[in-house]
Amino acid sequence: CDNISKLTFKNVKYETHLENIKMDEYKLQNMTKILPVSIYVEDSDPDGFNGIDMSESIRAQVETYPIMKKYFDEMENKYQWVICAMPSMEWAKKVFPNDKPKEAFKKLEEAILKTTRIDKDAIKNWKEHVKELQEKAKILNEYNFDYLEYKSSNGTDLKIKLMPNHSWLSARETTLGSNVEFTANMPTEEVFTMPSYEGVDGLVVSTKPLSFRG
């Protein structure tokens, strides 16, 4: 998949990207009708897009987003979905650089099973985990913060204003209409809310390997 994407970014022109996006629109049209349960599985190379110029593709995506947005809005919170990851050799070598490729792959596989809480009693583990996250979200809602401030000895100094009447949510989501509960990300450790895009000021320093657009 990464290799196909590389060829696309390297060789496909802006006008062709616009044509290809019509296929994505057709797919979204059908998704809004059937609202399928979706499982997204990733196993990509963290450095897969190093040195690749994606400007043509990004420009096409930005231009066509207003067309796509109506479909995203139509489906929002109406269907169940989950994103999870499978190990790849490239990813495994990044995480376990001192091990042989097959051993690194096995270690990453075991780490994913553990962090996604499916190595033992998965249903019990997730019920307990979701309950804990929901309790933390409840506490944050009771505090009703105006802003969040992050400071660290590594140089991070960031202030983020929150939207008025914001609400903290956690791993458990419920579909609109059908009222089906689901967890969208595996793993997930987050509680989250809505910041103000005009109220972010400061600097963030990454202390871990960071993959940004490959």
Predicted features and spans:
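Active-site bordering "gate/hinge" segments
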Residues: 1-200
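Long, well-ordered mid-to-C-terminal structural blocks that present hydrophobic/aromatic surfaces
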Residues: 194-214
